[in-house]
């Protein structure tokens, strides 16, 4: 290589820069990915550590922002003209595709972080040309700056779009904070080509936790399963996909019909004319992708999904014309100019029904996608669609509510909602808990209650396990779960196998006795069972530390309340049941991924760092908090004592480990010289000695002088977990 091609400073070739070259992942593809525990650090956030988005949002004049957005709707720009002179449908699609990545399986995806701005979502095939929607919003974002995040602005723009076209939204809540780097924890599928669908196995069984049918799609393939224009089969895909996004059949029909009341699809020409996506586009395009060589590349020449046309004759007006069109014609299968399957009315007069989006001298027939026709052909969807057709007000309310759910589902409880447009109505999918209506216990009463709990006969193991079971349901992905509400005493959580439903009532009954005795006293000072469950765990941790020679106080903040069964959607909460909980050495069945990968996944959902995950495992083991009393990983002869024995014994070179199961998931540790059996372990336990990064952390806690640090770090991580979901 000539000198001209080398860096003039270092003499290196252009490929020899920091971060390049063969990576650890290249050498060891199956290496445990701990990077997902350390995403979104302050080093990537330009806003600074003192920035408080909630406080900034309170300064926002939401009505002024709404006025500016309404004006933008009809301010068509030559560089990207508005269809029908109105950007409303475009912004609805942007907001929908921001929120529509949410899936209930792990709570990941959704609109809560503004991730549509970043790879891979900014370049998904289903998001073609939404980069222009965000650029249209830039002048408004520029004006309001830090007072509104991109995440909130995209959703609010969708709300304003709906209202500007004639339907009052159910409400809007702010509070979504932007991220500044792509989310590495989200499993979008393992396909290596856009629109690949190896996520299916057997009889079209979709891989969990995925919801979309193909890589790079938000929902279903609008042309039908794998492009097969079969409306009945498409209905099955629609049902599964929307169900995995927390929508029932009525909500699904309302969303599809309501969303497709507005706007049009774009498939004016061959997709081969379209250039690379934003991430692959040349630098001079400044983050805009999909530059098209077809005609003007915009307006009437736009190519996006490949499907071409509008659903209704009134694409920028809220009305019932979607159902009028769906049920008013018989439909013929045809191909768009881009070669995509779509349906047109058999009636030739329909060719005059829809105005052109840019040329008033032209008209077109309405179109339906195969997915649209599933609302007419599916035996469950069809009666719902007909009822909505006959009852426009019911349809309008159903769509407004479903849209609110779609765009707010991943925000968690109402306590996180910000702004003057938050609806008053409490909704079951928000996982409501009662407001605090009593005086909270003080430090003296906390100490007294701790003593009563420890004197009740409940063991350290049981108290720690119960508190963990209550709090560790939290997942930060959609801000659900946690100790608030004490739902461990309600269906479905009380019956989860991991919570040992045969033993759980004894503990809950004793805590309820203590609660009732305390609350029967005069005055307005009360304690909830939710608080007592956590307090019991804290008392047990304190006792464990005392047993190890450390006199500590575990932090405790009261204020949790007890939810009722009526406030708890059993079906909705079922998805929070842990398939595995490595902190309790529990795994329901054998999975295709390793137990240690499942541990890291759960730790990420609980916002734990690698050091926090490590110290919690070590503490939970010596506190004897394993599922069903298992002794795997209890590397101590003093269970119930919060010491660093787990680490010192794991790192002991006098122990030799061998697998005792064909799948290498259970192990025994024997004395290197005598062969005497010392310990048993799972992969979860041994990964802290096998993985180089985790071993480095384990060595910190395995040192002879680390006892106090271990206790303090465990308490800090424990307190963090106990307060997850408290907003």
From Swiss-Prot:
Cofactor details (free text)? Binds 1 heme b (iron(II)-protoporphyrin IX) group per dimer.
Q: Which UniProt keywords apply?
A: Heme, Hydrogen peroxide, Iron, Metal-binding, Oxidoreductase, Peroxidase
Q: Which GO terms describe its cellular component?
A: cytosol
What's an example of a GO molecular-function annotation for this chain?
Answer: metal ion binding
User: Could you say which EC number(s) this protein's record lists?
Assistant: 1.11.1.21
Q: Which GO terms describe its biological process?
A: cellular response to hydrogen peroxide; hydrogen peroxide catabolic process
**Transmembrane parts of this sequence:** none
CDD domains noted in UniProt = catalase_peroxidase_1, catalase_peroxidase_2
Superkingdom as given in the UniProt entry: Bacteria
Chain positions covered by the region annotation Disordered: 1-26, 346-365
Provide the record's note on post-translational modification.
Answer: Formation of the three residue Trp-Tyr-Met cross-link is important for the catalase, but not the peroxidase activity of the enzyme.
Gene3D superfamilies linked: 1.10.520.10, Peroxidase, domain 2
Q: Where is this cross-link: Tryptophyl-tyrosyl-methioninium (Trp-Tyr) (with M-245)?
A: 96-219
Site for Transition state stabilizer, residues? 93
Record-annotated residues binding heme b? 260
Catalysed conversion reaction: H2O2 + AH2 = A + 2 H2O; 2 H2O2 = O2 + 2 H2O
Catalytic site positions: 97 (proton acceptor)
**Which cofactors are required for activity?**
heme b
Tryptophyl-tyrosyl-methioninium (Tyr-Met) (with W-96) crosslink: positions?
Answer: 219-245
**Pfam family for this entry, one:** peroxidase
Stretches of Polar residues bias are at 11-26
> What protein family is recorded?
Belongs to the peroxidase family. Peroxidase/catalase subfamily.
What does the record note on quaternary structure? Homodimer or homotetramer.
UniProt name for this protein: Catalase-peroxidase
């Amino acid at each position: 290589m000539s000198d001209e091609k080398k860096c003039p400073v270092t003499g290196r070739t252009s490929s020899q820069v920091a971060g390049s070259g063969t990576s650890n992942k290249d050498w060891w593809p199956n290496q445990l990915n701990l990077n997902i525990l350390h995403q979104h650090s302050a080093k990537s956030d330009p806003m600074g550590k003192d920035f408080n988005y909630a406080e900034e949002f309170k300064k926002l004049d939401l009505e002024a922002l709404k006025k500016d957005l309404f004006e933008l709707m009809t301010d068509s720009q030559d560089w990207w003209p508005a269809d029908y002179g109105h950007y409303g449908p475009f912004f609805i699609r942007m907001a929908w595709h921001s929120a529509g990545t949410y899936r209930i399986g792990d709570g990941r995806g959704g609109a809560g972080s503004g991730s549509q701005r970043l790879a891979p979502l900014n370049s998904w095939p289903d998001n073609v040309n939404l980069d222009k929607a965000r650029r249209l919003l830039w002048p408004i974002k520029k004006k309001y700056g830090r007072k509104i995040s991109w995440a909130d602005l995209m959703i609010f723009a969708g709300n304003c779009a709906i209202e500007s076209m004639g339907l009052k939204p159910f409400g809007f809540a702010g509070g979504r904070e932007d991220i500044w780097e792509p989310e590495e924890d989200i499993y979008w599928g393992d396909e290596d080509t856009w629109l690949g669908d190896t996520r299916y196995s057997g009889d079209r069984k979709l891989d969990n936790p995925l919801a979309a049918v193909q890589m790079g799609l938000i929902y279903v393939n609008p042309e039908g399963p794998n492009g097969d224009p079969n409306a009945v089969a498409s209905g099955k895909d629609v049902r599964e996909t929307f169900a995995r996004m927390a929508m029932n059949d009525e909500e699904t029909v309302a969303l599809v019909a309501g969303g497709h009341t507005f706007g049009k699809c774009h498939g004016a020409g061959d997709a081969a004319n379209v250039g690379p996506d934003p991430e692959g586009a040349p630098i001079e395009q400044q983050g805009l992708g999909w530059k098209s060589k077809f005609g003007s590349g915009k307006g009437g020449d736009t190519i996006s999904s490949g499907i071409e046309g509008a659903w209704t004759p009134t694409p920028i007006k809220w009305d019932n014309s979607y159902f009028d069109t769906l049920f008013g014609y018989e439909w013929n299968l045809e191909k768009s100019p881009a070669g995509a399957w779509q349906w047109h009315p058999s009636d030739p007069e329909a060719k005059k029904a829809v105005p052109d989006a840019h040329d008033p001298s032209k008209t077109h027939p309405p179109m339906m996608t195969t997915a649209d026709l599933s609302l007419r052909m599916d035996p469950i969807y069809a009666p719902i669609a007909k009822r909505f057709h006959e009852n426009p007000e019911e349809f309008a309310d159903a769509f407004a509510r479903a849209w609110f759910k779609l765009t707010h589902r991943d925000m968690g409880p109402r306590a996180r909602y910000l702004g003057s447009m938050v609806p008053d109505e409490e909704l079951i999918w928000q996982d409501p808990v009662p407001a605090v209506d009593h005086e909270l216990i003080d430090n003296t009463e906390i100490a007294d209650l701790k003593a009563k709990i420890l004197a009740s006969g409940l063991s350290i193991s049981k108290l720690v396990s119960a508190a963990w079971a209550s709090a560790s349901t939290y997942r930060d992905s959609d801000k659900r779960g946690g100790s608030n509400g004490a739902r461990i005493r309600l269906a479905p959580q009380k019956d989860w196998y991991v919570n040992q439903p045969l033993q759980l009532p004894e503990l809950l009954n004793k805590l309820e006795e203590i609660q009732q005795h305390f609350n029967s006293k005069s005055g307005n000072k009360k304690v909830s069972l939710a608080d007592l469950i956590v307090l019991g765990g804290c008392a047990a941790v304190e006792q464990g530390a005392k047993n190890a020679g450390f006199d500590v106080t575990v932090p405790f903040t009261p204020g949790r309340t007890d939810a009722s069964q009526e406030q708890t959607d059993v079906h909705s909460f079922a998805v929070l049941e842990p398939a595995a909980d490595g902190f309790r050495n529990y795994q329901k069945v054998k999975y295709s991924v390793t137990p240690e990968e499942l541990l890291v996944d759960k730790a990420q959902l609980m916002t734990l760092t690698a050091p926090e995950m490590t110290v919690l495992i070590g503490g939970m083991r010596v506190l004897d908090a394993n599922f069903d009393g298992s002794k795997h990983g209890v590397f101590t002869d003093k269970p119930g004592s919060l010491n660093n024995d787990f680490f010192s014994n794991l790192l002991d070179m006098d122990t030799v480990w061998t697998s005792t199961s064909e799948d290498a998931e259970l192990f025994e540790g024997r004395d290197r010289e005598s062969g005497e059996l010392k310990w048993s372990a799972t992969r979860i336990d041994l990964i802290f000695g096998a993985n180089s990064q985790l071993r480095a952390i384990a060595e910190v806690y395995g040192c002879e002088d680390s006892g106090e640090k271990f206790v303090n770090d465990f308490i800090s991580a424990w307190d963090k977990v106990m307060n997850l979901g408290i907003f």
